[in-house]
Amino acid sequence: FDADSKEFNYTEEDIQNCLDLVKSLYDNNVCAPASYSSAYSNDDLQSDPNWIAGKYVCTFAYISTINVMTAANEGATYGTGYLPLLDGAKDNGWACNCPQVLAVTSTCKAPEAAMKFLDYFFNSDDAESTLACVRSVPPTEKAREICEKDGTLDPNMMTAANIASGYSGLTNDKYSSAPESKQIIADTIEAVGYGTTDPASAASDMYKQLSSYISAQ
């Protein structure tokens, strides 16, 4: 969405095209049935016995959770690939999501001590080696060199970061990233997955729901 005008950056037809793809994935058994996979939603696929047993071919994951997914089935060989894109796509489908931000507030009682910690956290070789790839690939070349040297730089995460760095991407706007919008989208996809609605009807309903929500903001 355009954060200033609240206008959609896509059409109802675009939504239907996406939902047609979702339906085809379920219809052709590319995805596990929605009735089964719903138990492992909310980034919990690593707990799915089928994933652990190596019965799935691939999955989507945040760069920061790739090592969580691979740790759930250490006997498999993993690779990192590109996001699928529709023909004629105007965007490459990648969005930057940075949920953790460290800052020293104006009400901090010991700002100097807090800044010393941040200096250690971001600039100390020891801290960079300790944190390693716990929360994704380190953002600085120095930290990556340290992690590569001590063997803590996950190669799959590094490959994913290199792929993402070549994308133009988008930043999350305040409307599409809002919990209400996310729930509307998730409910729509789930309804198509369960077969309780068709892509065209679902697209129309989703467009109306999002329009109603955003116009009220």
Which residues fall in each region the model found?
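Glycine-centered hinge/linker elements that transmit conformational signals in sensory
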Residues: 5-39, 83
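Pocket-flanking alpha-helical
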Residues: 45-49, 65-73, 211
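Alpha-to-beta junction loops
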Residues: 47, 52-61, 76
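Short helix-initiation/N-cap motifs at beta->coil->alpha
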Residues: 35-52
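Long, aromatic- and glycine/proline-rich binding clefts that accommodate carbohydrate-like moieties
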Residues: 81, 131-191
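Beta->alpha turn/N-cap motifs
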Residues: 60-66, 84, 100
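Periplasmic solute-binding protein
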Residues: 1-5, 19-20, 27, 90-105, ...
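Extracytoplasmic/periplasmic substrate-recognition and gating elements
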Residues: 31, 71-137, 187
